[in-house]
Amino acid sequence: MQVKISDSIKYIGVDDKTIDLFESQYLVPNGISYNSYLIVDEKVAIMDTVDKRKTDEWLENLDRELNGRTPDYLVISHLEPDHASNIKVVSEKYPSMKLVGNAKTFSMLPQFFPDFDFADKTVTVKEGDELELGSHKLTFIMAPMVHWPEVMVSYESAEKVLFSADGFGTFGALDAQEDDWACEARRYYFNICGKYGVQVQNLLKKTAKLDIRKICPLHGPVLDENLGWYIGLYDIWSKYEPETDGVFIAYCSVHGNTAKAAEKLCEIIKSKTDKKVSIADLSRTDLAEDIEDAFRFSRMVVIAPSYDGGVFPIMNDFLHHLKIKGYKNRKVAMVENGSWAPSAA
């Protein structure tokens, strides 16, 4: 898909609409984009590669935008394979090209490419270091655990562009993006980065000092309007604050009786408030969307039957995911159902 950023900053990423599960667990009915960028100046810098599923298409995009030039640098924001799988391929194609990363990047790199010697190809940067490309200049900002330890973002000062790694990313291919950015961005954030709110807050504080006109993430659309709104949502999410004053009812039901109780509760709550109320049968909904809603709302009711001397397994899995993602700062009520040995609560 053609994405216009500027005359000097080119989009060379790809859409993947054949993938069914992102990270082998998140449903992506609209696919995913693997974003990659090219800065063309006196020197040329590639900003990340893409997943190995799309190597050939990415190389075609790169060759087209290079227009006969040779890249001087490959900036590695994030070593996760959906962004770094083609480091070896492009290094072999352009042997004079240098890899730009931080110390953690290069300590981890051999794990992914053990049969390739990068020793004389690396430029190690740290917080605040700059890379001059001509009229464009990149400043590197370390973002450890957003959401891997080697992650860094880059700020291009001439055009005021933040290359934000996985930050501000969304699920969905670029040609299948919904109008509601927040929906897929929220689902992406809480399931991919949600555990690392403190680290996201640290990054937001660093970037607050910058004059940012565009945000170029590694997944999802380039953001170039109303950036304060996007950043504001990230601030809310990473502080673990509710975004919506309302109630999320999450339930499981073996024979339908607990479902009746959940639906009746939903009806009663709706009759007593004008706040938003959402209900989900966890056995039949997307877990990632349920995690998203749990974090979105200010209140949650979990309703489940007893099973094998404990809570129903699907509810147990849901609660486990909330725990590891750092769920807090909400009011929660629990309802258990059990005829002869109630044990869910």
Q: Residue locations for each model-derived region?
A:
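Conserved beta-strand hairpin/beta-sheet module of binuclear metal-dependent hydrolase folds
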Residues: 2-62, 153-156, 160-164, 258
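Metallo-beta-lactamase
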Residues: 4-7, 101-225
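Short glycine-rich, flexible loops that bind phosphorylated cofactors or substrates
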Residues: 19, 224, 308-310
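Active-site neighborhood of phospho(di)ester-bond hydrolases with catalytic His/Asp-centered motifs
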Residues: 47-49, 71-79, 99-102, 162-166, ...
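Active-site metal-binding motif and surrounding structural segment of the metallo-beta-lactamase
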Residues: 53-100
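Short helix-loop-beta junction
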Residues: 263-278
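Helix-loop-strand module that forms the ligand-binding subsite of alpha/beta enzymes
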Residues: 284-345
